[in-house]
């Protein structure tokens, strides 16, 4: 994006105000007022940036592109002169992704909203744990049962989760692959920043452990990644069979 102007590039609410947002806190279900706000881009600018990313990846010989928001968040623009509904945006996103896929590039999306399933090669950060509401007795992988064998997916980055072992077991139960988020920089560089969630991302510090986890997982479950899930049963508290 070559420069950003709020009145030109930001999407609009129905009351004609520009869409200015704050990050959402999953712990207390409210806006994080101590964080920096950001503006929601107009739909056409989002699509143009995806196209630019695809062209840049092709220039460098990239095998594919990874998209953080498409497939995860779908927004409208209520600008009275150029109204774009969520349904219109969905159709335009799918058309663009179909074109990228037809060019031979692979596509990785986030979270896994169903409208992108036909054009997605891999989904990251798929929810494997449910809402966690105390009134629920159990979580059942309905979505994963429906799509397993058709598209590959993974839960959270294993090295960044609060409970690595729990996420690993959930991945096995839900037929998910493994996903890691790594960086070359030392974790100490993240101190006193807003990126402390990446403390576990240093490659040198974790490569041996992660390689061992991946090797065992691939050896024991690699042969079933492209098969359908035909049954899922809760045998006892904390014990399931897929």
Enumerate the language-model features and the residues they cover:
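Hydrophobic residues within beta-strands of alpha/beta enzymes
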Residues: 65-67
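Active-site-proximal substrate-binding groove within the catalytic cores of carbohydrate-active enzymes
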Residues: 3-62, 71-242
């Amino acid at each position: 994006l070559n420069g950003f102007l709020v009145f030109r590039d930001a999407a609009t609410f129905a009351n004609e105000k520009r869409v200015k947002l704050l990050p959402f806190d999953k712990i207390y279900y409210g806006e994080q007022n101590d964080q920096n706000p950001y503006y929601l881009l107009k739909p056409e600018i989002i699509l143009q940036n995806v196209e630019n990313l695809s062209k840049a990846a092709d220039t460098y010989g990239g095998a594919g592109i990874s998209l953080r928001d498409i497939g995860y968040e779908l927004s409208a623009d209520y600008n009275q002169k150029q109204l774009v509904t969520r349904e219109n945006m969905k159709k335009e996103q799918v058309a663009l992704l179909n074109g990228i896929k037809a060019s031979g590039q692979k596509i990785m999306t986030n979270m896994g909203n169903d409208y992108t399933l036909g054009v997605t090669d891999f989904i990251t950060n798929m929810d494997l744990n449910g809402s966690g509401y105390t009134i629920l007795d159990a979580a059942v992988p309905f979505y994963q049962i429906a799509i397993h064998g058709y598209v590959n997916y993974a839960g959270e980055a294993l090295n960044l989760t609060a409970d690595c072992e729990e996420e690993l077991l959930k991945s096995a139960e839900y037929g998910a692959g493994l996903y890691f988020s790594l960086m070359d920089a030392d974790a100490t560089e993240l101190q006193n920043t807003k990126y402390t969630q990446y403390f576990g991302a240093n490659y040198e510090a974790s490569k041996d452990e992660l390689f061992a986890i991946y090797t065992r997982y691939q050896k024991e479950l690699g042969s079933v990644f492209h098969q359908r899930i035909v049954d899922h049963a809760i045998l006892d508290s904390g014990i399931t069979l897929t």
